[in-house]
């Protein structure tokens, strides 16, 4: 789910949009203190979160496959120009996931191309 679209990478999204993103990692998760995660949230730096089908972040393995704090899937730098995320948004193509419903294309690369004038 898009938690904040303050980053140019997420300019093509709306807060609350839900995307299905491939997850392919055996290790790693977002960890930080409660104080820091609250500060990140207050500053709009939590970009994306793992959510259930109703858009609610959770800690259940079916929702949050790696146990990330606050179900954080992605964060940004203070200016939003750097986006770090766990899911593989680059692993999409038309018809690739025929048996999995959902929206896949967050337009990350299109938005970045437009912002950075590439």
Regions found by a protein language model. Name each.
Residues 1-118:
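Amide-donor transfer/coupling interface in amidating biosynthetic enzymes
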């Amino acid at each position: 789910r898009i938690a904040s679209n303050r980053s140019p990478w997420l300019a093509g999204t709306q807060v609350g949009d839900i995307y299905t993103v491939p997850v392919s990692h055996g290790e790693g998760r977002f960890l930080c203190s409660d104080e820091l995660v609250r500060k990140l949230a207050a500053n709009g730096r939590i970009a994306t979160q793992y959510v259930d089908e109703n858009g609610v972040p959770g800690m259940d393995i079916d929702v949050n496959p790696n146990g990330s704090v606050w179900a954080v899937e992605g964060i940004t730098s203070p200016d939003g120009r750097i986006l770090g995320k766990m899911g593989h948004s680059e692993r999409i193509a038309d018809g690739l996931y025929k048996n999995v419903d959902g929206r896949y294309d967050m337009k990350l690369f299109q938005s970045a191309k437009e912002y950075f004038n590439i």
